[in-house]
């Protein structure tokens, strides 16, 4: 009768609940948990007992790739946030969101997922975020994070160059999509539940799997392959399921 039930903060307001059956969970316990949470008017997704479940696993590149782009000197915090929010439709840019969550909390989640996946480079934490957390730049709660909340006029303005912005959006989005596809590939959850989790759990503008259907699987494969060829790092390796879907010309939601 053991089962995991994961709420999102703040629990009274956030609609999503992830239900995680353990190895020893029986069908009656699972069905009872699903019915209970639905009676509370929550949106339920069921997922495998793996690190990060659905949301905290699939969302890692939203923070990690944004930090990597900053560390490479491609764009500053404000420009990356502008690209993801204004061009991508995300409710908050990654640096605004990390400041809202708290750099200490967000870093700890990334580090725990990284360790739980046996140091898979896809989830590698950022030294930038580690140093900010160590310096006490925790975000809104400390008055200073990637942005200065006590002296907001000191923050840089975004460089609203659409070519640069499109590059940033494409790079972060293809990494998110690759992670969502990996969750399907590894049977973490169904395509429907994974998209539901990302739209209801972290307010993404679209489900990532519906998004790749819309953009084209070949387009996303090409973006990932370019990054993989350029950097030679496993974090950019396209998922085998994506390659198979391109070869077979299939979609997650054909209708």
Where are these regions (language model features)?
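Alpha-helix N-cap/N′ positions at the starts of helices
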Residues: 12, 61-62, 172-176
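Rossmann-fold dinucleotide-binding core
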Residues: 1-57, 91-92, 103
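Positions in alpha-helical segments
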Residues: 15-18, 64-65, 178-179
């Amino acid at each position: 009768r053991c089962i995991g039930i994961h709420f999102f903060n703040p629990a009274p307001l956030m609609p999503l609940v992830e239900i995680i059956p353990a190895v020893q969970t029986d069908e009656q316990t699972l069905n009872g948990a699903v019915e209970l949470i639905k009676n509370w008017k929550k949106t339920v997704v069921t997922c495998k007992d793996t690190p990060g479940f659905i949301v905290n696993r699939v969302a890692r590149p939203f923070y990690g790739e944004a930090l990597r782009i900053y560390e490479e000197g491609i764009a500053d915090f404000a420009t990356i946030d502008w690209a993801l929010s204004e061009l991508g439709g995300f409710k908050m840019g990654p640096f605004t969101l990390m400041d809202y969550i708290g750099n200490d909390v967000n870093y700890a989640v990334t580090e725990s997922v990284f360790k739980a996946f046996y140091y898979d480079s896809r989830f590698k934490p950022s030294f930038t975020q580690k140093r900010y957390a160590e310096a006490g730049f925790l975000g809104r709660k400390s008055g200073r994070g990637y942005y200065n909340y006590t002296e907001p006029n000191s923050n840089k303005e975004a460089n609203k160059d659409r070519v640069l912005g499109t590059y940033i959006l494409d790079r972060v989005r293809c990494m998110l999509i690759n992670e969502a596809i990996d969750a399907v590939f590894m049977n973490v959850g169904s395509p429907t539940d994974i998209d539901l989790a990302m739209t209801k759990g972290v307010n993404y503008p679209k489900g990532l799997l519906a998004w790749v259907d819309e953009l084209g699987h070949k387009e996303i494969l090409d973006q990932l392959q370019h990054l993989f060829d350029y950097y030679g790092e496993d974090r950019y390796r396209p998922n085998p399921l994506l390659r198979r879907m391109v070869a077979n010309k299939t979609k997650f939601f054909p209708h």
